[in-house]
Each structure stands twice: as structure tokens, then as C-alpha cells.
Amino acid sequence: MTILEKNIQALLSGVNEPLGNKLLNFIQNKTCSRFNIDENLNIYDKTHNVFMYENLEEEINFFYQSILEKTHRYPFACIYGIGNALLIKNLSKHYKHLFIFESEIELFILALSVIDLSEELYSGKIYLADIEEERVDIQLLILFDMKDISEYLSLYEMFVNNVYYKKFYEDIWHKADELCEKNIKVVIRNLGSNSDLSFECYSHLLQNIPSMLESIPFQRILSERKNKFDNTIVVSAGPS
């Protein structure tokens, strides 16, 4: 069994049958005409006459470090673009779930032909989302409603796989981002929370952390002002 067949089999096991069937139908009736992949796993785009990676190793390492720094200890991450799947494979060990969004069927085919993601697909660690799938909204609602995801939806951010996607797929990347935000708001609303308020509170927390860390520690306030006043009023907001 080839790597591609193993990956498709994993998708067809119930992980993402629509995508599995779409890939199976493609390899049975078509061939990749726009993209190809070389022995170094660099992908060539015949339409724009460019390679996906100018320096494959450096670029993958840069985005690997950049995404990890911004999602330290996050239970999940969302990335637009499967690329050659090396970045996805490397990042998967750091998260409970990794959601990968892609619009090009040929890029799914090429990536899944060279990198074995079957174990991660079977376990749910990696989920491949075809944003051209007509039922993608339903898929995302189910995924984002999982308990180990729904509790952390305010952490959501869409990252991009590499510079190539930023340059040639900006509109589709934003479409995927809007798709996720729309479904996240539905999930949070169904949980009884105000999604806009949730995102706003998280934004305020990040903005105020520097000043909070620089503020006078509460124990120091007590030691400096003990017995100097008859009454004290403590004003606090948010979780303590």
C-alpha cells in the first residue's frame, strides 16, 4: 500500500469520508496538471511558474518556530495550506488537534503522497478540511463543539503554512478564516456565551498583561500601608 493509499484509507475510516472519496475519485480519473513535487519535496506551481519554497528547510523551520511561539501550550492550532505536509507532520506532536485547511485538491494529493499522516488522521490529531466541500460548515461545527476544543475557542487564530500561500492565496486564506470565525461564534452562542464578548475579553487580557506584571504586588501594598488607614476598599475585576 502506498503512502497516499494509507492516508486515503484513514480519511475513509470515518475521519473525513467526503475528502477521502474526493481524493480517491481524483486519482482514479485525473492526474495533477497544475502542481508537481520534486525529490526534495518542493512543489512547483505551473500556473505562476514558481516553487512553493524558496529555501525549503529554512522556511519550514521559520514557520514551525513562529507558530509554536504564538501557540505555546495551546491544545489546538489552525493552519491554512497543507504545503508538502512536512510542517504539519512536525507540528502535530505539539497539539491535541491540528486543523489544516486547503482548497487545492492537487496539493492534498501531492502532500499525502509523500508524508504518512495516517496515524495522526486516525487518532484525530490532524484534521484536513477541504474548504471547497459543501458541508464544511457542518464539519467545523462538529469539530469546534468537541469538549477539548470548545473550552479554548477564544484562543483561535488562523496561521499560514508558508510565504507562497500568503502571496497567492490571500483571499482564500481569509475566506477560511472567516469560515472558522463564523462557526466558532455559533458554537459559543450555543454554549450560552457571547462570542464577541469572549474574544474582546481575551484581547483585553493580552493587552493588559504587561501593565499587570509591572503593578505593585498585593502583599507589598499590605505591608506598606498596614495600620495607616481605618478603612480599605479593594476593587477587582475578572478571575482572581
Where are these regions (language model features)?
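N-terminal donor/sugar-recognition subdomains of glycan-related enzymes
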Residues: 1-233, 239-240
